Curated annotation (Swiss-Prot):
Keyword terms, alphabetized: Hydrolase, Magnesium, Multifunctional enzyme, Nucleotidyltransferase, Repeat, Transferase
Cross-referenced Pfam families: ACT (PF01842), GlnD_UR_UTase (PF08335), HD (PF01966), NTP_transf_2 (PF01909)
Gene name linked to the record: glnD
Name assigned to this protein: Bifunctional uridylyltransferase/uridylyl-removing enzyme
Keyword Membrane annotated: no
Region spans: Uridylyl-removing: 339-699
Activity regulation: Uridylyltransferase (UTase) activity is inhibited by glutamine, while glutamine activates uridylyl-removing (UR) activity.
Alphabetized InterPro entries for the sequence: ACT-like_dom_sf, ACT_dom, HD/PDEase_dom, HD_domain, NT_sf, PII_UdlTrfase/GS_AdlTrfase, Polymerase_NTP_transf_dom, UTase/UR
Domain HD: 457-579
GO BP of this protein: regulation of nitrogen utilization
Lineage, opening ranks: Bacteria, Pseudomonadati, Pseudomonadota, Gammaproteobacteria, Moraxellales
EC number: 2.7.7.59, 3.1.4.-
Catalytically driven reaction(s): [protein-PII]-L-tyrosine + UTP = [protein-PII]-uridylyl-L-tyrosine + diphosphate; [protein-PII]-uridylyl-L-tyrosine + H2O = [protein-PII]-L-tyrosine + UMP + H(+)
Family membership: Belongs to the GlnD family.
Length: 887
């Protein structure tokens, strides 16, 4: 038990009412000691509420309000006896009639004393019964607080009034409708998901508010004080109550730790606190486990808990509507459509014909979802049926999974062209999908502790399936024209659906998740009617689901050898088509910020180039001379009407073969035209245009200037100052010692090509900086995003030799931060290295960048130089990461 000094004795011994402040501090320490010694969080928060009661009663008497006919009520969480360390103390002073002048003075004394105490954070309302009626009638928040108003001290005759007022001012239907609208708004504010990276454990879907919501609506109608009382009324089962209470205790415990760590009323489970709170629950990484194992397992428990809470919230409130609200509507007539012997449609929702359907006909579990998938007019599942379904899902075992009828039903759901995503989400939510595919059950709620994967693995997987399904819908053909066309001509679309379902299914197990997932998929495919050849294709897609994105992200896809190597790994058009659709859907399901028209253009270019190689013949070597001649001819056709061919060729003869291999005819014509118009002007030439292949997002910046040691470093430093993010860079040095540089950038503000003044500012800034090669622009100091400080990313530097180019390829992986590229460019400059090309990728909090470099003499670094440079670059990245973490 929690033993505390009686407040009266404590204050008397200190001869000062402000001693309550110290008393509460001492009490809080005792409560924490009790918690750490094993006392339940329920007992702790109730004890804290009771102790606050004691303090308020003392202050009430001190203000001589015990001599009045007023009542002091606890409302909100305090009214429910749910006080966390820094919770608000919400109270209502209620009077039957107008408050006398004398009582107003007493109330003023009471409120002043409450503030004088110091460590209370009071929220105070003073009302008469009449004002309560008036405010409750128009203010849902007031009505809600009255439902749970608890008399602490004072006039006991007032105790009955708060709920009576709500009954007078709100009907069951108006209150239910208002609270459901309020919940929908709250859900929208939290992205309508339980699995935000930094969830608000109080207000997000599946949080404490969802449990409160059940209580508010049920207490309003059934006039009970506790959710427990609803068991006896048949509104909630003992099992459901146990699930809610366990979830509530877990959420309270998290909130308890959040309050103590933040030293305030904090409900957001921020990255700042996740790892530390995970440790308090015992989720600590053991030796040999991934660095984020502990925090990921803790968050997995949270997400699963939130899913349980939101599911019960949905079911119980739907049950209330169907059993209490709807039958009482004027002129209500139940609409029933018989589907078959197992199911009927009642008021547009599917329902079982009788309560033993799932027990007597286990196949009906999947049959229900087959009907949902193929009947877009059905609005959901009736609450009684949902309750039976959730229990029935727990009985899905290996025998159930091995049943050919069940396997055929599952594949019929997967092949449904109508509501695949919504159906699979429902199957997951109600426990069917995770029990039918146990490996999927293991990834439910699994998050990856980073900013790149913004969804849990299960949510990401279902979004991927949604994206694939959208490729066959006309409304999305504009957004994904090429991939939609490719998807619609796939011979077996269900092959890519199963590959999608299993592509990440082995995450969290350790080992290579692609290999393990492929093994699971082969076993599943054989059981579900796929041929051995089809199973191998599914497995290959899972094993190689990152191949296309990594090739586009990390390699120079303008290099024919890169494309040829990629095409050879695929072997035929079938593998290319399936992989392309899977890759585009996967990227779009990972992080909305990851997909843009620049990345789309990379995927499209890689697909079309690989398609051409496969159609031409994989065994044929690249004919570089023919490629160069074809490109020159196409470029000259674009220039012939405006420039003399001799002038064009004079520019071209200064450029090497690599330029004509890697640049398109359109880009060569653009560059050549600009150079010829620029003439002998000594000032650097800077041009901007929308990227022709990437539509609106990406901007091409072309720079023609005398070659200089710090060219790349200066350029990226200026671009960073201009809020432009470099995605790609090509630096070509002509024999005339001029440099032709093309940068692809994304504009953080999206106004670069629509705001002439800003475009001119960017041009002028580049011209000025490049005209003063000895004055390298300093790095701009930017605010470090809060989230970045909590990620422990190992900095890696890998320097290899590209034999064909005779250039060093420098790959870095580090914590992304403002000015990173400018910092790295400056280091290359100080080490006397020339950058010939760069490929930039930002994956959440991680930057994975690739640079091709040589020394000033055009030669690559030798082994000793590589070792020394790698150490210096690694040290610089480590220093930058440390500064971020300490910021």
């Amino acid at each position: 038990m929690i033993n505390t000094s009686p407040l009266l004795n404590y204050v008397s011994s200190h001869h000062d009412i402000k001693a309550i402040n110290q008393w509460r501090t001492d009490v809080e320490k005792q409560l924490q000691d009790s918690y750490e010694n094993g006392q339940s969080i329920r007992e702790i928060i109730k004890a804290r509420s009771d102790l606050v009661d004691e303090a308020l009663v003392f202050l009430w008497k001190h203000a001589e309000l015990d001599q009045s006919k007023l009542g002091l009520f606890a409302v909100g969480g305090y009214g429910r006896r749910e006080m966390l360390p820094y919770s608000d103390v919400d109270i209502m002073i209620l009077s039957e009639d107008e408050i006398s002048e004398e009582n107003e003075k007493r109330i003023s004394t009471f409120i002043s004393s409450l503030w004088d105490v110091g460590n209370f954070k009071p929220g105070i309302s003073v009302r008469t019964i009449q004002s309560c009626v008036e405010q409750a009638a128009t203010d849902l928040t007031v009505a809600t607080t009255l439902i749970e108003a608890r008399l602490i001290t004072g006039n006991t005759q007032l105790a009955k009034w708060p709920r009576r007022i709500v009954s007078q001012t709100w009907t069951d239907k108006t209150f239910y409708d208002a609270k459901m609208a309020e919940q929908a708004k709250r859900y929208h504010q939290h992205n309508n998901t339980e699995s935000n990276l930094e969830p608000d454990i109080k207000n997000a879907p599946g949080g404490i508010r969802d449990i409160n919501q059940i209580g508010w609506i049920a207490k309003r109608h059934f006039r009970v004080n506790r959710i427990y009382d609803l068991v006896h009324l048949g509104f909630i089962s003992e099992f459901e109550l146990a699930v809610l209470e366990e979830a509530e205790s877990f959420l309270w415990e998290i909130r308890h730790h959040l309050h103590r760590l933040a030293k305030r009323d904090e409900n957001r489970l921020l990255f700042d606190h996740q790892r530390e709170i995970a440790a308090k629950f015992g989720y600590v990484r053991q030796e040999g486990q991934p660095v984020n194992y502990g925090v990921e397992q803790f968050m997995k428990r949270y997400y699963r808990t939130a899913q349980q809470v939101s599911t019960l919230n949905e079911m119980l409130l739907a049950y209330f509507s169907e059993s209490v609200i709807t039958p009482r509507l004027p002129n209500y007539e139940r609409k029933i459509e018989v589907v078959n012997d197992h199911f009927k449609i009642v008021d547009n929702k599917i329902a079982v014909q009788h309560h033993k359907i799932f027990a007597e006909h286990p196949s009906a579990i999947l049959e229900l979802f087959y009907i949902l998938a193929n009947r877009p007019d059905i609005e959901g599942i009736r609450a009684r049926t949902l309750r039976l379904l959730i229990l029935a899902a727990k009985r899905i075992n290996q025998s159930y999974r091995d049943n050919p009828e069940h396997q055929a039903l599952f594949m019929s759901i997967i092949r449904s062209p109508y509501r695949l995503y919504d159906t699979l989400v429902a199957m997951k939510r109600y426990g069917v999908l995770g029990n039918y595919i146990p490996a999927f059950g293991q990834i439910m709620g699994l998050m990856q502790y980073d900013l790149f994967h913004i969804y849990t693995v299960d949510a990401h997987t279902l979004l991927l399936l949604r994206n694939l399904n959208r490729f066959r819908e006309p409304e999305f053909a504009k957004e994904f024209p090429v991939v939609s066309s490719v998807f619609q001509r796939l011979a077996r679309q269900d092959i890519v659906f199963i590959a999608a379902l299993f592509h990440d299914i082995a995450k969290g197990r350790g080992g290579d998740h692609s290999e393990l997932g492929a093994e699971d998929a082969i076993e599943f495919g054989r059981a579900h009617g796929f041929t051995e050849r089809e199973c191998k294709l599914i497995a290959w897609l899972i094993q190689n689901h990152l191949l296309m994105s990594l090739t586009a992200q990390k390699k120079d896809i303008s290099d024919p050898d890169v494309v040829k190597d990629f095409a050879e790994k695929l072997g035929d058009m079938e593998h290319l088509d399936y992989l392309y659709t899977l890759t585009v859907a996967d990227i779009n399901a990972t992080n909305p910020k990851l997909w843009n028209t620049w990345r789309a253009s990379l995927m499209r270019q890689l697909y079309t180039h690989a398609r051409d190689v496969i159609r031409t013949g994989l065994g044929r070597p690249v004919d570089y001379q023919m490629l160069i001649e074809d490109t020159k001819f196409a470029a000259s056709e674009l220039l012939v009407n405006n420039f003399a061919l001799a002038d064009v060729e004079k520019v071209w003869q200064e450029l090497g073969d690599e330029y004509f291999i890697k640049e398109s005819a359109d880009e060569i014509a653009w560059h050549t035209q600009a150079i010829l118009k620029h003439g002998d002007n000594p000032e650097p030439l800077v041009l901007l245009r929308a990227h022709r292949k990437a539509a609106q997002d990406a901007v091409q910046i072309f720079i023609y200037t005398r070659d200089q040691p710090n060219l790349f470093a200066t350029t990226v430093a200026v671009l960073d100052r201009m809020n432009l993010d470099v995605q790609d860079a090509k630096i070509i040095t002509a024999s005339t010692a001029f440099s032709l540089d093309t940068y692809v950038v994304l504009d953080r503000f999206g106004t670069l090509l629509t705001d002439p003044e800003r475009e001119e500012t960017v041009k002028n800034a580049l011209v000025k900086a490049l005209s003063q090669p000895d004055q390298y622009p300093g790095l701009m100091q930017r605010r470090i995003p809060r989230q970045l400080r909590h990620f422990d990313i190992e900095n890696t530097v890998d320097v290899t030799l590209n034999e064909a180019l005779q250039q060093n390829m420098v790959e870095i992986s580090t914590l992304d931060h403002p000015g990173l590229l400018a910092r790295v460019g400056g280091l290359f400059m100080m080490q006397g290295l020339d950058i010939h090309s760069a490929r930039i990728a930002t994956l959440g909090e991680r930057a994975e960048d690739i640079f091709f470099v040589t020394k000033k003499d055009g030669k690559p670094l030798n082994n000793e130089e590589v070792k020394l440079f790698s150490e210096k670059l690694k040290a610089a990245l480590d220093e930058a990461s440390n500064q971020i973490c300490q910021h």
